[in-house]
């Protein structure tokens, strides 16, 4: 019997919906040989890619430029998600505007036309959904 493999867009949407439901997720990067983890809340789908947002002046931005491999972790009270992949900066105004339109409260600190706003999308993504009551399930996009 052939196993059903979801389309990449459906897998990305499932990850997006889970992150939105959680509200806050934790982004792990590496600085030299030291892991760094901090809370994040921005996540959007734009042009069939999963994006996050930060500021170029922040250490997290510099860490992702030096080593684009990241892991995101989120927990909804029952299930947790570990999403790994590589972040790719997108300097286009359209991508920045889409993110800031989705999070208007950030407009006090960021603007799609400034030199600080940074949006990045994830590639080579693998998301593992886990819980104490069900086997782990992996999706990729």
Predicted regions and their residues:
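Short, Lys/Arg-enriched N-terminal segments with co-localized hydrophobic residues
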Residues: 1-11
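Short, basic, glycine/proline-bearing loop/turn elements
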Residues: 2, 26-27, 41-50
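Charged, gly/pro-rich active-site loop segments
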Residues: 2-4, 82-141
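A short, Trp-centered hydrophobic/proline-enriched beta-strand micro-motif
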Residues: 17-31, 70-72
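A short mixed-secondary-structure module that forms the rim of ligand-binding clefts
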Residues: 43-78
């Amino acid at each position: 019997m052939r196993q059903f493999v979801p389309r990449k867009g459906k897998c990305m949407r499932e990850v997006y919906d889970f992150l939105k439901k959680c509200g806050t997720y934790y982004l792990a990067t590496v600085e030299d040989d030291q892991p760094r983890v901090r809370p994040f809340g921005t996540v959007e789908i734009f042009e069939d890619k999963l994006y996050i947002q930060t500021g170029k002046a922040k250490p997290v931005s510099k860490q992702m430029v030096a080593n684009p491999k990241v892991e995101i972790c989120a927990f909804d009270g029952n299930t947790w998600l570990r999403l790994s992949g590589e972040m790719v900066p997108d300097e286009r105004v359209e991508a920045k505007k889409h993110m800031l339109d989705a999070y208007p409260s950030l407009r006090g600190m960021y603007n799609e036309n400034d030199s600080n706003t940074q949006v990045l999308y994830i590639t080579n993504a693998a998301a593992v959904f886990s819980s104490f009551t069900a086997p782990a399930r992996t999706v990729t996009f």
